[in-house]
């Protein structure tokens, strides 16, 4: 199969993966309106073409939290990454490090912090949820520090799990789900051998290190579901600050008032995000929410954005709307599922190539020169 864009990786991943895994990554909440708008709203933003600008000295490099990034992209935290490729978190982290960008480890990764951090030559980021079991949270923070993690991504838009109806149809949940998953694995032998057999253990590594006595993935997911905390408030972030003195990014901001509160709290960054359309259907796409948030807090806090980014052109659009850096999730996961570490490396090279073309043809020699003047019109204007 010819791979020329991230959408090709999606098609390849759909063929290779058991349906319960593909649709778990691909799906969103409820009727998936926000999931679709994340992509379509970005695609509807027209770039302003400029020519004859002598773009021979173009640079994608940027600085974020005392890190140099080869381009303004980081790999987003994606749960269960190790179910999409053998020891998937390790492979994705290596690809990100090789390209000179951060990898963000999810709380609910298959591989533990201690397995991934030594595999790369730059500090990874770590994502954490607010959970009822504060002992686990403290343990995770201590282990992240010990592993050399510098930047914490604190997810605040998941006090309760979203209603993901597609999971019941695909076999991730619903009637006879375990039997359906076994059958799907049997009918996808390449995945069954590479990940299902050779990718063991299949537990949530960061949680199993804390709980001990592994009992299986379903048990850990059940424990996690019972530990999401709807009482989350800014006081919980104050508690986190007692244990974390490095950069803290608050992920899940869609409103300018919440962004202002993040500045007051003293956060180092925010991620404008609707969790990839996986939490509350009907909320704004990240592209639609970003301009007002940038108007409110740009310069006071670092602004990251995710949800709907499928190409280097989309990265340029998000930067023009006000982001300093973007996170990509599904795009890298499909590449990982298809060709492992090599797939993610190739995807990042595609993103970089697409960004370079877009910057040359919009007259932006550096990331700082990508502004709203790079757009013909903003979304909704």
UniProtKB/Swiss-Prot annotation:
It is a peripheral membrane protein. One of its GO terms (molecular function) is L-lactate dehydrogenase activity. The active site is at residue 275. GO terms for cellular component: plasma membrane. The keyword Glycosyltransferase does not apply. Coiled coil: none annotated. Keywords: Cell inner membrane, Cell membrane, Flavoprotein, FMN, Membrane, Oxidoreductase. It comes from the Bacteria. Residues 1-380 form the FMN hydroxy acid dehydrogenase domain. It is an enzyme of class 1 (oxidoreductase). Catalyzes the conversion of L-lactate to pyruvate. Is coupled to the respiratory chain. Belongs to the FMN-dependent alpha-hydroxy acid dehydrogenase family. This is L-lactate dehydrogenase. It comes from Pseudomonas entomophila (strain L48). The lineage of its organism: Bacteria, Pseudomonadati, Pseudomonadota, Gammaproteobacteria, Pseudomonadales.
């Amino acid at each position: 199969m010819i791979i020329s864009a991230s959408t090709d990786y999606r098609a390849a991943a759909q063929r290779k993966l058991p349906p319960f895994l593909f649709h778990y990554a691909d799906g969103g909440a409820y009727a998936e309106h926000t999931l679709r708008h994340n992509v379509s709203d970005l695609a509807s933003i027209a770039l302003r073409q400029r020519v004859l600008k002598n773009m021979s000295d173009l640079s994608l490099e940027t600085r974020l939290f005392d890190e140099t990034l080869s381009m303004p992209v980081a790999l987003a935290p994606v749960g269960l990454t190790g179910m999409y490729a053998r020891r998937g978190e390790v492979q994705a982290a290596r690809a990100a490090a090789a390209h000179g960008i951060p990898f963000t480890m999810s709380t609910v990764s298959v591989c533990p912090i201690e397995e991934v951090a030594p595999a790369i030559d730059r500090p990874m980021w770590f994502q954490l949820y607010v959970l009822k079991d504060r002992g686990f949270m403290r343990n995770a923070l201590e282990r992240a520090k010990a592993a050399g993690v510098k930047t914490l991504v604190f997810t605040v838009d998941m006090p309760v799990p979203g209603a993901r109806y597609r999971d019941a149809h695909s076999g991730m949940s619903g009637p006879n789900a375990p039997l359906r998953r076994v059958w799907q694995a049997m009918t996808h032998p390449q995945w069954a051998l590479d990940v299902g057999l050779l990718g063991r253990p299949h537990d949530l590594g960061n949680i199993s290190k804390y709980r001990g006595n592994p009992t299986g993935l379903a048990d850990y997911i059940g424990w996690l579901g019972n530990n999401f905390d709807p009482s989350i408030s800014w006081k919980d972030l104050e508690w986190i600050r007692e244990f974390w003195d490095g950069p803290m990014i608050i992920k899940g901001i869609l409103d300018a008032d919440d962004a202002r509160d993040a500045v007051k709290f003293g956060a180092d960054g925010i991620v404008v995000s609707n969790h990839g359309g996986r939490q509350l259907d009907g909320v704004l796409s990240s592209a639609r929410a970003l301009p007002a948030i940038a108007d409110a807090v740009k310069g006071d806090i670092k602004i990251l954005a995710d949800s709907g980014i499928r190409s280097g052109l989309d990265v340029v659009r998000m930067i023009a709307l006000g982001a300093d850096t973007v996170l990509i999730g599904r795009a890298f996961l499909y590449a990982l599922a298809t060709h492992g570490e090599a797939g993610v490396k190739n995807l990042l090279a595609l993103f970089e190539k697409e960004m370079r073309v877009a910057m040359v043809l919009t007259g932006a020699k550096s990331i700082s020169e990508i502004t709203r003047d790079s757009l013909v019109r903003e979304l909704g204007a």
